[in-house]
């Protein structure tokens, strides 16, 4: 999540970066103060890294819930937002696997997710 971007900052700088305080992101499953020493070397092997803002996390949580009729964990919805951004940069058709899990959303986060109606904007790969 963009507001809990310790991993992205660590990748950019080449050393583990720490957040000064816990963020209030919808994607609480990815909200760490810093990446672990065992995890960081694996992150460094990635070809890219996407930071997804809270609006996109809410957008994809709503759309996945609407389309699949299941409560999707906002952290998984964040991954969907990153995949869509990646797909927009591809010049040929790609096959992508996004693993979705669900159910772990407290009432306050659910209210925040549905505060705005994102279902009025249909998902698209158009830039």
Stretch-by-stretch model annotation:
Residues 36-93:
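Active-site-adjacent helical/loop segments in soluble small-molecule enzymes
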């Amino acid at each position: 999540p963009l507001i809990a971007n310790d991993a992205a900052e660590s990748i950019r700088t080449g050393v583990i970066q720490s957040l000064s305080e816990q963020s209030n992101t919808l994607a609480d499953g990815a909200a760490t103060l810093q990446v672990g020493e065992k995890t960081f070397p694996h992150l460094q092997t990635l070809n890219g890294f996407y930071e997804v803002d809270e609006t996109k996390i809410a957008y994809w949580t709503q759309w996945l819930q609407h389309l699949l009729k299941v409560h999707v964990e906002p952290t998984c919805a964040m991954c969907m937002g990153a995949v869509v951004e990646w797909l927009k940069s591809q010049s040929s058709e790609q096959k992508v696997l996004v693993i979705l899990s669900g159910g772990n959303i407290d009432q306050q986060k659910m209210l925040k997710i549905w505060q705005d109606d994102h279902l009025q904007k249909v998902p698209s790969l158009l830039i």
